[in-house]
């Protein structure tokens, strides 16, 4: 089965561009990460932005300019090749999706590795909770919101959130479990009425895919590592690269290493 791929085999398939799908449900137990890659002149401001917004942008590590490797997350990880799909922005505008960064890499680029909510999915599943998008074989639903980030330097904007539906009973358990994973966005930022956080139509996510919400379920929203992409569109750095929403870097680190409590 596809989702039974070992981490090594999955990474090989990603690096060879054989695997280009969303990574939710893959490599259970391993920390998945968002990427933001910026010119060094913009890196200090973005580092401050992460420090001021740890729920939306939980910083795992950051590289030196030009470095494509980060031993703290994996000895063999190549940040320019080991994501299923990258998004390229110029002046804050989305320009292209690319399978790797071989032709785009520059010596002044600084890579920020940010935690992802996919990392706590195994803990939810092991506790007996079902995750709708994984069960349906879909990417997670993600939405722009009216929740403001704390501005820092050149960077400002609003949260993006991911959504998973649960019954009220299961939602309480999900809150308890995910609180243990602050480096994967931690506890939800909202549950219930989507309009309170500026979502007008829950059936039309801004990123990812829609999932069905049963009549006895409520939507539960976590901060999402697509937030920087929203901020980039507003802050307009001259050049930026990110992961494609839902298509993450899978590290060698276990999610449990970053758990608390």
UniProtKB/Swiss-Prot annotation:
InterPro entries per record: D-Glu_cyclase, Putative_hydro-lyase, UPF0317
Which keywords are on file for this protein?
Answer: Lyase
Q: E.C. number, please?
A: 4.2.1.-
Q: Which GO terms describe its molecular function?
A: lyase activity
Q: Which Pfam families match?
A: D-Glu_cyclase
Q: Report which superkingdom the organism of origin falls in.
A: Bacteria
Q: Which family does it belong to?
A: Belongs to the D-glutamate cyclase family.
Q: Which PANTHER family does this UniProt record tie to the protein?
A: D-GLUTAMATE CYCLASE, MITOCHONDRIAL
What protein am I looking at? Putative hydro-lyase VSAL_I1435
């Amino acid at each position: 089965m596809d989702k039974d791929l070992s981490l090594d085999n999955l990474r090989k398939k990603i690096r060879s561009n054989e695997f280009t799908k969303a990574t939710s449900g893959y490599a259970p137990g391993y920390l998945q990460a968002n990427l933001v890659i910026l010119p060094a002149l913009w890196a200090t401001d973005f580092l401050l932005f992460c420090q001021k917004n740890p729920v939306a942008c939980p910083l795992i590590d950051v590289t030196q300019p030009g470095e494509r490797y980060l031993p703290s997350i994996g000895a063999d990880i190549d940040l320019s090749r080991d994501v299923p799909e990258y998004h390229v922005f110029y002046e804050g505008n989305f320009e292209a999706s690319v399978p790797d960064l071989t032709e785009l890499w520059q010596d002044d680029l600084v890579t920020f590795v940010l935690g992802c909510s996919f990392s706590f999915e195994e803990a939810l599943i092991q506790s007996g909770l079902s995750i709708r998008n994984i069960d349906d074989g879909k990417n997670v639903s993600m939405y722009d919101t009216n929740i403001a980030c704390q501005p820092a330097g050149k960077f400002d904007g609003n949260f993006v959130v991911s959504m998973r539906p649960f019954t009220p009973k299961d939602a309480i358990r999900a809150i308890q479990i995910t609180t243990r994973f602050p480096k994967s966005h931690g506890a939800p930022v909202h549950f219930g009425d989507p309009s309170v956080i500026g979502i007008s139509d829950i059936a039309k996510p801004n990123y990812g895919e829609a999932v069905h919400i049963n009549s006895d379920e409520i939507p539960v929203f976590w901060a999402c590592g697509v937030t920087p992409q929203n901020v980039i569109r507003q802050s307009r750095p001259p050049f930026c690269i990110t992961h494609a929403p839902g298509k993450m870097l899978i590290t060698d680190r276990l999610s449990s290493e970053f758990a608390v409590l």
